């Protein structure tokens, strides 16, 4: 006894190849394209792809159009001379549809950046991935993240790392967080928030030298002609010294600083009148040309960028507006007084007047140990002039040994898990070409 209903395949074939079905799928396709066009205009191409163009529903509509074309041609077989134009047009549409399907399944969708005279062979693909690297073991795990437009819950585990949530478009909510790793008690890892204003604008700034601070919290910042430079607090007293050479030497590990005058070091000049200073260090000598580079020169006159001893020439920062911040202190060069000035910044206290454009700066928050972090929150992106001005953060929430961590495209995570160093990144899949391209 046959319990399955009898299917009239001929009726299904006639319906798919009918004008009625064609009108339905083309209408749905048109509606999807209209919605996608508006989304792409306001929220960006990536959001439109995730929300409309590359969703299973929209793909099924396009597949329905392809089936409609195929069955419309089949229903008009065997060939008739008066339909040769119909067969030609529909054959072309079928070829285009099959080509689009092959491109979607086996094609590569990505971008390659070509700077002038700089060859490149790496293509950044559209697929989001989370990359877990064990540097000491030379092992790397790559997991693909869902191609979704909104927050998605996940439940994937690798070793002791659980992937809990993925947010393709997020904005950061500022918070101070505890550091992941341990640091010496005297480590210079502070961060500060300032409020800057002048006659034309005002802005809140967050600067940090904490090694765990993300890319959005740097130690340098430029606002028009004015540059902000954030340094360890222990360097402030060296800036306050108006020593004749205007050179500072410091240890980048201990953040200790001194001037050549304090160590009775002689400033010499070359035949081309370039200043240099020689520092005895660890049974050897370090030669600095501070007006050209903070790093010492070796015997082959190559800079040693691995050296922990650096030299700083204050002369280089006297012509243009440069503000040096040391947490609770600020320094700048005063042309009217012809000297460097150091001022204290009281936490949430009175503002300090700067010598440029009637500018003022106020210290609004300062943390010696905590890390500045933008906790990701799901949002709808906003596009302006071809780039995202909101929602440009891609974030993954992890759970590692009972603790919650966030990894974003701006802030990779580096920590020890049961004695093993692990680096976790949220990034895009990359493809290396077998050849180079250049402009």
Where are these regions (language model features)?
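Internal alpha-helical transmembrane segments
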Residues: 56-128
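Alpha-helical transmembrane segments and their helix-start/interface "positive-inside/aromatic belt" motifs
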Residues: 7-26, 85-93
């Amino acid at each position: 006894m046959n319990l399955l209903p009898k299917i009239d395949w001929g009726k299904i074939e006639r319906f798919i190849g009918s004008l009625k079905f064609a009108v339905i799928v083309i209408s749905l396709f048109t509606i999807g394209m209209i919605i996608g066009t508006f989304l792409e205009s306001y929220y960006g191409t990536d959001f439109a792809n995730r929300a409309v163009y590359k969703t299973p529903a929209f793909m099924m509509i396009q597949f329905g159009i392809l089936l409609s074309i195929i069955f419309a041609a089949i229903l008009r077989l065997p060939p008739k001379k008066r339909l040769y134009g119909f067969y030609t047009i529909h054959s072309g549409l079928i070829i285009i549809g099959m080509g689009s399907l092959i491109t979607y399944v086996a094609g590569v969708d990505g971008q390659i950046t070509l700077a002038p005279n700089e060859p490149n062979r790496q293509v950044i693909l559209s697929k989001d991935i989370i990359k877990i690297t064990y540097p000491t073991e030379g092992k790397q795990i790559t997991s693909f993240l869902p191609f979704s437009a909104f927050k998605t819950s996940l439940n994937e585990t690798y070793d002791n790392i659980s992937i809990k949530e993925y947010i393709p478009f997020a904005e950061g909510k500022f918070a101070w967080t505890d550091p992941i790793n341990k640091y010496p008690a005297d480590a210079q890892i502070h961060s500060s928030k300032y409020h800057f204003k002048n006659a034309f604008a005002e802005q809140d700034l967050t600067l940090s030298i904490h090694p765990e601070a993300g890319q959005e919290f740097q130690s340098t910042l430029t606002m028009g002609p004015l540059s902000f430079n954030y340094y360890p607090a222990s360097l402030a007293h060296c800036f306050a010294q108006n020593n004749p050479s205007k050179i500072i030497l410091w240890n980048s590990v201990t953040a200790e600083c001194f001037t050549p005058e304090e160590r009775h070091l002689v400033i010499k000049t070359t035949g081309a009148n370039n200043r240099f200073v020689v520092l005895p260090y660890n049974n050897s000598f370090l030669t600095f040309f501070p007006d050209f580079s903070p790093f010492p020169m070796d015997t082959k006159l190559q800079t040693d960028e691995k050296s922990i001893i650096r030299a700083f020439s204050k002369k280089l920062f006297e012509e243009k507006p440069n503000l040096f911040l040391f947490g609770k202190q600020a320094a700048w060069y005063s042309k009217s007084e012809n000297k460097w000035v150091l001022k204290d910044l009281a936490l949430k206290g009175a503002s300090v007047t700067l010598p440029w454009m009637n500018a003022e700066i106020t210290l609004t928050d300062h943390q010696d140990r905590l890390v500045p972090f933008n906790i990701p929150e799901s949002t709808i992106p906003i596009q302006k002039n071809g780039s995202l001005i909101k929602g440009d953060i891609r974030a993954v929430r992890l759970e590692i040994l009972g603790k919650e961590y966030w990894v974003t495209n701006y802030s990779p995570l580096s920590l020890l898990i049961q004695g093993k160093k692990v680096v976790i990144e949220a990034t895009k899949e990359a493809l290396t070409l077998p050849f180079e391209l250049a402009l």
